[in-house]
């Protein structure tokens, strides 16, 4: 059986919290920001949790997290 490896792209995008939930960054905050309102950009600042339907696939990409 081959060695299990962590997907490096996933390890840079996600963090496992102490409670076991997975933290992710918000999308739509990199460019084309002039047409977005200040309120919208402010709400995109924080982090969010990965949705429960995607948790299994994220955990499969990070077997040691």
Curated annotation (Swiss-Prot):
Cytoplasm among keywords: no
Compositional bias (Basic residues): 1-15
Pfam families, alphabetized: Ribosomal_L35p
Database matches in SUPFAM superfamilies: L35p-like
Keyword Ribosomal protein: yes
GO MF annotations in UniProt: structural constituent of ribosome
GO BP annotations listed: translation
Annotated keywords: Ribonucleoprotein, Ribosomal protein
GO cellular component: cytosolic large ribosomal subunit
Region Disordered: start-end pairs: 1-27
Family per record: Belongs to the bacterial ribosomal protein bL35 family.
NCBIfam families: rpmI_bact
HAMAP family: Ribosomal_bL35 (MF_00514)
Protein name per Swiss-Prot or TrEMBL: Large ribosomal subunit protein bL35
Organism: Bordetella petrii (strain ATCC BAA-461 / DSM 12804 / CCUG 43448)
Taxonomy of the source species: Bacteria, Pseudomonadati, Pseudomonadota, Betaproteobacteria, Burkholderiales
């Amino acid at each position: 059986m081959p060695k299990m490896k962590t997907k490096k792209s996933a390890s840079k995008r996600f963090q496992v919290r102490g409670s076991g939930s997975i933290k992710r960054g918000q999308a739509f905050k990199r460019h084309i920001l002039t047409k977005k309102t200040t309120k919208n950009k402010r709400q995109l600042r924080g982090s969010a949790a990965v949705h429960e339907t995607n948790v299994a696939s994220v955990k499969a990409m990070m077997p040691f997290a």
